[in-house]
Swiss-Prot record:
Belongs to the PanB family. This is 3-methyl-2-oxobutanoate hydroxymethyltransferase. The keyword Phosphoprotein does not apply. GO terms for biological process: coenzyme A biosynthetic process; pantothenate biosynthetic process. HAMAP family: PanB (MF_00156). InterPro entries: Pantoate_hydroxy_MeTrfase, Pyrv/PenolPyrv_kinase-like_dom, Pyrv_kinase-like_dom_sf. Disulfide bonds: none annotated. Coiled coil: none annotated.
């Protein structure tokens, strides 16, 4: 999307109408948000994936609403042009629509422009309640990581016709409930293409093929920071190797006395060191 004005929900919806591909990437902190925004992404997802790639947790289940608030606020401080979408973490919207609205409101207050929930038609009441409260919603169908235990692990969605129809129904229901976009995760590409054709709102794929209106990747996968990235992620740079090399060089410089070098440290004003020495000697002589 051209220009430097703030990207809005309307801009995202219009991008599909214009045939413009939507670029989405995750960010969880101020510096990363600034960098990806300067690179020209359209949407920044503050994903609950931060649990694994930032906090070292075993899954998204341990991510709290407070975690999401803190990282959303950090991203928002970068004042990105991109639209900020914050994930609603596990059990922050499932119990009741009231909980969903109150918790989503906290993420909006933290700086999100929209929230994402895992689900579509099955959470139509929740989506409607959020939209009614003035909170833009991105739905999420196909593989839904928050329900990986129920699904029996991280499995490709839509492998059979009956499974595919269920994913399609979820996506259609999300649009009918008022979602302005749908993320389709790790789903058979034919199913993602059918959903994209059927919906008037944008579809954003992750591991679901090239026929969606946009794509999203976890920034750590994109930059080569993840030890075991998913098979659908493309590593655009081996930043892990670059970081290891840089820190190794720094450690070597410290141990060999090469860091800090000239121009990286400063002294006292002329004559002040001599005064300091006299003061130190006087103090030593007084026995204090």
């Amino acid at each position: 999307m051209a220009g430097r004005e703030k990207v809005t929900v309307r801009d995202i919806v219009r991008a599909k109408q214009r045939g413009e591909r939507i670029v989405m990437v995750t960010a969880y902190d101020y510096i990363t948000a600034k960098l990806v925004d300067e690179a020209g992404v359209d949407m920044i997802l503050v994903g609950d994936s931060l649990g694994m790639v930032v906090l070292g947790l075993p899954s998204t289940h341990q991510v709290t609403l407070e975690d999401m608030e803190r990282h959303t606020a950090a991203v928002a401080r970068a004042q990105p042009r991109a639209l900020i979408v914050a994930d609603m973490p596990f059990m922050s919207y499932e119990a009741s629509t009231r909980d969903a609205v109150l918790n989503a409101g906290r993420l909006i207050a933290a700086g999100a422009d929209a929230v994402k929930i895992e689900g579509g038609a099955s959470y139509s009441d929740t989506i409607r309640a959020l939209v009614r409260a003035g909170i833009p919603v991105v739905a999420h169908v196909g593989l839904t990581p928050q329900r990986y235990k129920l699904l029996g692990g991280y499995r490709l969605a839509g492998k059979t016709a009956s499974e595919a129809m269920e994913v399609i129904r979820e996506a259609i229901g999300a649009e009918e409930a008022g979602a302005f976009a749908v993320v389709i995760e790790f789903t058979a590409w034919e199913v993602a293409r059918e959903i994209t054709r059927k919906l008037s709102i944008p579809t954003i794929c992750i591991g679901s093929g090239p026929y969606c209106d946009g794509q999203v990747l976890v920034i750590h996968d994109l930059l080569g920071l993840t030890p075991t990235p998913p098979p659908f992620a493309k590593k655009y740079v081996d930043l892990a190797a670059i970081i290891r090399r840089a820190v190794s060089e720094y450690a070597s410089d410290v141990r060999n006395g090469r860091f800090p070098g000239e121009g990286m440290y400063w002294g006292m004003k002329r004559g002040e060191y001599e005064k300091l020495q006299r003061l130190i000697n006087e103090q030593a002589g007084s026995g204090d």
